[in-house]
Amino acid sequence: MSQMTYKRVLLKLSGESLAGRQLTGIDPDTVAVLCNELSSVIELGLQIALVIGGGNIFRGLSASAKGMDRSSADYMGMLATVLNALAIQDTLEKKGHPTRVLSAIAMQEVCEPYVRRRAMRHLEKGRVIICAAGTGNPYFTTDTAAALRCMELKCDALIKATRVDGVYDKDPLKFDDAEMFKHLTYEETLRRHIKIMDSTAITLAQENNIPIIVCNMFNGSIKRAILGQNPGTTVEGE
């Protein structure tokens, strides 16, 4: 077997990835397929933390643009991430992988509160952890939450799994001639406003020298990224 490049990673998933063809809500069949991908990664023996968005259920920024109070909209979006986290937890545990959901907003009846030292201990014991409810604060995206948890938990890399194979010069779902970047620097990504993650998340990764790997969430790409095979786009320093 190939040697793992990373021992502990944070995996960022979009909420839309759980919706499947229905585009909204949680599709159990899609969740099952996604968890099969995650299972193959977990079985490598590395420590894995997940951050999942909530856009399949509610998008705070979109609601704010239509007149809803921004803080209220963002809190609703955070609650949506908890629903997604519980769906992933249930499916992973049915596959035999002990999983803990840790929420930045206290709701002890359904999940644990996010406490950094507790999260680290779960990882050390071989449990998958899912960090839910973003940062617990409005005005911060789940991309920023992913970068923050990545630093706090001392992960070796931040992997963003998407519906496409990496980062392109234009939307590959709309343009057949779109070209994929294999490598980008943090500076280039910020300067060219390449929409990998929001600028706060990229800056956090840059300041802490954490590579960001963007790859497809299916077809074994996450596993190949762990093994250092660079299946998508890697963003790092010079």
From Swiss-Prot:
Cite the Pfam families for this sequence: AA_kinase
State a single Gene Ontology molecular function.
UMP kinase activity
Instruction: Give the record's pathway.
Output: Pyrimidine metabolism; CTP biosynthesis via de novo pathway; UDP from UMP (UMPK route): step 1/1
Its UniProt entry gives the catalysed reaction(s) as: UMP + ATP = UDP + ADP
**Binding residues for UMP, per the UniProt record?**
G54, D74, T135, G136, N137, P138, Y139, F140, T141, T142
Keyword annotations = ATP-binding, Cytoplasm, Kinase, Nucleotide-binding, Pyrimidine biosynthesis, Transferase
Which amino acids does the record list as binding ATP?
K12, L13, S14, G15, G55, R59, T162, Y168, D171
Class in the EC hierarchy, top level: transferase
The protein's Enzyme Commission number: 2.7.4.22
Q: Has keyword Magnesium?
A: no
Record carries keyword ATP-binding:
yes
| InterPro entries attached to this UniProt entry | AceGlu_kinase-like_sf, Asp/Glu/Uridylate_kinase, Uridylate_kinase, Uridylate_kinase_bac
Q: Name one GO biological process term.
A: 'de novo' CTP biosynthetic process
Annotated localization = Cytoplasm
Example GO CC term: the record gives:
cytoplasm
The way its activity is modulated is described as: Inhibited by UTP.
- Report the sequence similarity comment from the record: Belongs to the UMP kinase family.
UniProt subunit comment: Homohexamer.
Briefly state the protein's biological role: Catalyzes the reversible phosphorylation of UMP to UDP.
Q: Can you say what this protein is called?
A: Uridylate kinase
State the organism named in the record. Answer: Lawsonia intracellularis (strain PHE/MN1-00)
